[in-house]
């Protein structure tokens, strides 16, 4: 490909699954002859939910839940056509959201 970069953003709730998927992508890209920048850990997005413990009374008694979204960024510099084919065929774990920009 003519001087292009592929930017891959990964999101997951479990950081271990995310790191394994990141390693798979990096190994695949390096094996096919592309240079990889990253993985760059992006800030973890924490979404908190506060709910009452009881159904009707005791406003002061509450419980908090949170969802943590872990994110990583990868840049593949000067990808070869073999790199693009290998990345298309790559089967990542369930629960990992992948965004690809050229």
UniProtKB/Swiss-Prot annotation:
Keywords carried by this UniProt record: Ribonucleoprotein, Ribosomal protein
GO biological process per UniProt: translation
CC per GO annotation: ribonucleoprotein complex; ribosome
Gene Ontology molecular function terms on file: structural constituent of ribosome; tRNA binding
Keyword Cytoplasm: no
Coiled-coil residues: none
Pfam families reported for this sequence: Ribosomal_S10
Top-level lineage group: Bacteria
Protein family (similarity comment): Belongs to the universal ribosomal protein uS10 family.
Subunit note: Part of the 30S ribosomal subunit.
Function: Involved in the binding of tRNA to the ribosomes.
Protein name: Small ribosomal subunit protein uS10
Higher taxonomy: Bacteria, Pseudomonadati, Pseudomonadota, Alphaproteobacteria, Acetobacterales
Gene: rpsJ
């Amino acid at each position: 490909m003519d001087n292009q970069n592929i930017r891959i953003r990964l999101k997951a709730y479990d950081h271990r699954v995310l790191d394994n998927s990141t390693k798979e992508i990096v190994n695949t890209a390096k094996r096919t002859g592309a240079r990889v920048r990253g993985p760059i850990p992006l800030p973890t997005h924490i979404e908190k939910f506060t709910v009452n413990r009881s159904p009707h009374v005791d406003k002061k008694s509450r419980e908090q839940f949170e969802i943590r979204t872990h994110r990583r960024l990868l840049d593949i510099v000067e990808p070869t056509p073999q790199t693009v084919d290998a990345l298309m065929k790559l089967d990542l774990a369930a629960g990992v959201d992948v965004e690809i920009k050229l």
